[in-house]
Amino acid sequence: MNYLFKNGRYMNEEGKIVATDLLVQDGKIAKVAENITADNAEVIDVNGKLIAPGLVDVHVHLREPGGEHKETIETGTLAAAKGGFTTICAMPNTRPVPDCREHMEDLQNRIKEKAHVNVLPYGAITVRQVGSEMTDFETLKELGAFAFTDDGVGVQDASMMLAAMKRAAKLNMAVVAHCEENTLINKGCVHEGKFSEKHGLNGIPSVCESVHIARDILLAEAADCHYHVCHVSTKGSVRVIRDAKRAGIKVTAEVTPHHLVLCEDDIPSADPNFKMNPPLRGKEDHAALIEGLLDGTIDMIATDHAPHTAEEKAQGIERAPFGITGFETAFPLLYTNLVKKGIITLEQLIQFLTEKPADTFGLEAGRLKEGRTADITIIDLEQEEEIDPTTFLSKGKNTPFAGWKCQGWPVMTIVGGKIAWQKESALV
């Protein structure tokens, strides 16, 4: 099916929002201009809505194989499509871990069979993510590994991390890290700060993250490797990354929507839906994340979509697993709480969710350019809705944002020229 989207707006190559039509033919973007006419195309009047590149998320958890009670490739990618994401990068904390040919081939077959959006899997740095034996990077790259990470289990051994970075550099691949110094975690379930003190909970100190980033940055410099920092959360981490960039070290970083919108002061009670890793930090950390995003220290926004069951989250804040679901709330949360409040512009938000992650990792995504694959999201910037977890397509309903009123909701997502998801009656 060919589609002609009429009367939309998009961000042009100069970074300005302008009026446009957009023609999709044979799965590709055929033309982006005003007043397009075309035969043999279904005309869809978007009536002034935003025509955006499909959103790109480099940090997601799909849980399959091994955790299908939390999420599946089918449910997770359908939730991603509903959130406007057309390309997502799946972390390797599955069971089994994609750490060898057999496991990666199985994962890729599952993706091919079930995914509603483009899914790029990470390969594990170490076998079973336990940090003792490096995986075969060459084989994992051959089978389509997006980059290498041990995800939520930071590589604690410096010699192992250096060896991994050297091997990745030879393959022109990135090493991606969840940064925690295990000896400083302190069995914490929240940030070490006012909230932990008030509720008598063990806290995770900010330095637990920043000291690990500092170590890895120096290792990356020694290996001449692209090193990407997951979900930055502290003022100290922002400072370390900023200094490294100024020194010319190949480091990039991401921040989550929840760390941009919330801090520990916003946690109403010992609610496990506010438990994520890294935890919500203090006000100064929150301000530093915004500053880092605006000055280029932090390159992109990624959801860290981490679904869990209601039963798991009901165990209480100390025993419940870390993580919140993120696909279906990311854009409206960021648009409402950052763009509408004048903290960043709409153009910047689009870049942080599209071209910046795509460019950082060399993906042919993130831009509406003629000849490229038609991965597109239509967003109604005027639509206001209340976040209702019962309507999520993800199996995970674990969100701290239930009841929040937000503007800027995706209404249609196109992947490879085909409609992957659309809101009923939104485009008539």
From Swiss-Prot:
Annotated residues for binding of Zn(2+) 2:
D151, H178, H231
Q: What is its EC number?
A: 3.5.2.3
Q: Name the needed cofactors.
A: Zn(2+)
Give the GO cellular component terms, alphabetically.
Answer: cytoplasm
Q: Which UniProt keywords apply?
A: Hydrolase, Metal-binding, Pyrimidine biosynthesis, Zinc
- UniProt key word Repeat: no
> What does it do?
Catalyzes the reversible cyclization of carbamoyl aspartate to dihydroorotate.
Stated family: Belongs to the metallo-dependent hydrolases superfamily. DHOase family. Class I DHOase subfamily.
The name on file for this protein is Dihydroorotase
User: What organism does the UniProt record list as the source?
Assistant: Bacillus cereus (strain 03BB102)
